[in-house]
Regions:
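Phosphate/nucleotide-binding beta-alpha loop and adjacent structural elements of enzyme active sites
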Residues: 1-257
Length: 257
């Protein structure tokens, strides 16, 4: 498919699925459409994808690369990093992002497909551990400097299975000031939300399990319905979510014998 056809396809989807600005929480199948709408189908931009995983399937940045964007892909699983090098144009770093105090160290990566994590205690229902490997740790700042990334950035996706705060600690938000940060948040607590809001970002949307954050000065706003959705998700629903997850863990341990 040539570039003109790709642009027409995605812009058509954006127009077709433009949503009323009432809701703030949406199902995951609308994620790509809403991202493209956010950037108005722009043909140029710079993305950063931490925990890039598969080159295309479920990729947060593949649609942008199709439109002509440039960027950085960070993927600690060496087999996937090699596939990214073969199938994507963006710069690939086969490392894991962490905090400044961990930079330069080697860490154990607990392999479990899309749920691969640096945290040995990380668990979600359905994950299947398949072993471990060693990976080099670097801060996101170091990677961006090495890649000669522009500032401000346009889009940053963070999907690191429980290591989000450490990644953010190695990411100078004042320097890079991305227009949109999309970060996986299972909503068991407010630690990620508080970190970002204290550093000049505001929550504006959620798609699937990903929170959307934009600079506090952004004109994007949340409706009263959106605020209610946030309160229900991140406050009222937390105790029930924690209990449900504990039940899943116990069930998984019981099945493992």
């Amino acid at each position: 498919m040539d570039l003109e056809a790709v642009v027409a396809q995605f812009r058509g989807k954006v127009r077709k699925h433009t949503l009323l600005p009432m809701k703030a929480i949406f199902p995951p199948e609308l994620e790509d459409k809403l991202k493209l709408e956010f950037f108005s189908g722009s043909l140029s931009g710079y993305f950063v994808d931490i925990g890039a995983n598969d080159p295309r399937d479920g990729s947060q940045t593949w649609p942008f690369e199709q439109l002509g964007w440039e960027g950085v892909l960070v993927e600690p699983q060496h087999d996937l990093a090699e596939r990214l090098r073969q199938e994507r144009r963006a710069k690939v770093y086969a490392v894991a992002c962490s905090s400044p105090k961990n930079s330069g160290k080697s860490a154990t990566l607990n392999l479990a497909g899309i749920h691969t994590s640096l945290d040995p205690d990380f668990f979600v229902a359905g994950m299947r551990p398949v072993g471990t490997s060693n990976v080099l740790l670097r801060t996101l700042d170091e990677i961006l400097i090495d890649a000669k990334a522009p500032a401000p950035l346009d889009f940053v996706s963070i999907d690191v299975e429980g290591h989000e705060l450490e990644v953010l600690e190695g990411f100078d938000l004042d320097r890079w000031r991305p227009s949109l940060i999309m970060i996986e948040d299972l909503a068991f607590n407010l630690s990620t939300h508080r970190y970002l809001t204290r550093r000049g970002y505001k929550w504006v949307r959620r798609t699937g399990i990903n929170g959307w954050y934009v600079p506090a000065e952004s004109p994007m706003t949340i409706s009263p319905m959106g605020h209610l959705q946030f309160f229900r998700k991140h406050y009222l629903g937390v105790p029930f979510r924690i209990l449900r997850e504990k039940k899943r863990r116990l069930t998984a341990k019981w099945r493992q014998g």
